[in-house]
Structure formats: C-alpha cells, structure tokens
Amino acid sequence: MNQIAYCNRIIFLLIFIFSIPLEAKLLKPTKSSKEKEILMVNGKRRLYYPISDEGTHYAVQGPTRIEFISRYPVIKNHKKSHPFKYLIVIDGEDTVSVRHRYKVQRSISSIQHPKHRYTYSGNYFINLEKGSHTIELLTDDNQKYPVLMRVLAKEFESMGKDKKVLKPMVHKNSLDLISDGKSIKYFECAPGLPLQIEATGKKTLRILTRLQFSDSMGQEDSYRIRVSEGTKVLGTYYFNTERSPSSQIEERMDRVPGKWRSCEVDVPKGKHRFNIEVLDKDKVVLTRFILY
C-alpha cells in the first residue's frame, strides 16, 4: 500500500453541483474507543481520541465531508513549534500522509493531564462519495506522544440563489475557461504567488479549483491548496483530478484544465481577508470564488 500517494477515491468529489455542509457530527471510533481525552477549548469541553498503536478505526456513510481536527500534546511551557504526522487509510486501499507543525495553544488544557499543553489544531478535509466507507488512522512510532484526533462528518444541502462571485484583491487578468459552450472566468494561483480574497460574513466561501495540465503531465494528477487568514491556517486541501474532455482555456490552447474540485471555508461575522496558495511546486491552479 502506497503511504505517500494521494488517493483517487477521496478526491474532493462534489455530489451536488452547489452544496454546503450542514452541522457537523462527531464520529466515535469503532475500535479502541475506550481511550479518550477531554480538552477545554474556549471554555467548552471537546472530546478527542488518541490514535492508538494498533490504529483507530471509523465507519462512515457517504456522501459526506470528513474533517480531521488533530492536536499534539507537549511538555508544559514548551514554546517552540512541534511537528506531528499521521496516516489516513480509506477503505483499506488508499493512504494519505498528513503532516502538521504548530505552536502550543496556551488556552487549551486537559483534566486528565494537567501538566501537558496542546498545539493549535491541524485541520485536514476529505470528501467521500455515496456508500459505506472505513477510515483507519495510523500514528508514527517515532513520536513521543499519540496524536489526539477529533473526526467530524458533515452532510450537504443546496447552496441557494443568494451567491456572489468574488475577485482576488490583487491579480493578473482573469482567464476565460470554456466549458460545455459557456465561458467562465478563473484566476491563476501559482506557487509563491498566493491570492487574497476579501469576504464579509457570516457566510460561506466556496473555492472552485481546476489544475492546469501541460503536455508533460499525465491523464491524472494531484495538487494541494492551503487557506489561511493572517498567520492562522484554516485548512489544507488535497485534490486528485483528471483532464477535462469538455473544457479548454481560451488563452492557453496548449494547456488543458482538470475537472473541477472544490472546498468550503466558513466566513464568520465581519470582514475577513483569506490567503489561498498552491503548495505543489511547478503546478498552476485556476480558481474561482463564490460567497453565499
């Protein structure tokens, strides 16, 4: 089993063309569920499960979006940032390696382990297609402490008509992407050149993405984007896509757009500025932003 490959079956697959997640449901492990950690986060009790040496297992019914919220326990008053990682195995076949590095969040505490402190949360998202699925989380033997995990599942609903297309604050000219005879404007996002989007909430920001395929690339490929606000990383999103047979980039006939993949970001009340960046070197992603 390839432990570093991006998995084809956990692509950000939109079951409905315009959909958003409903309220999240906390998933409980089907095995190794006796061990748990209760953390106080912003005055609220939050239940986490440590990833066991034998692996932590979940049973999930799709279509749904899964959010993995992970934290790492550290020695009290340790100020430096701490790397940690874990593996996600979907349906016993596809595996993704997730890596985070965060500083200690001083406001987090534990009743069971008062001498420990905990990092800021690392958030990782996947979408699962319709049907029954299994998820297994595996830890790294070299880590001193087990990664604490909180797994949430969110269903989908229609986005509705109240939506607005946003443009990046600073950008090059938009590109016209022709799909099924319709022209849609996208904005290029490349490594080292993040886009900034200003949005006012309380709303949801949908980010539509298409990987730009060159002649040297294969029929399928993977890419990652990271969404942040200031220094806070809101989420890292992993996509797998393939060349679109029904779309083309009008200004770049020597390039082929991939099939679109998307993710959603919650926009709290007030004005916010989000950074969207591509994490894979030498890959260009075409983006479109919808606020609703």
Regions from the language model: what does each represent?
Residues I90-A153, E229-L291:
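Beta-strand-rich ligand-recognition modules
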Residues L39, I88-V89, L177, V227:
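Short aromatic-centered micro-motifs
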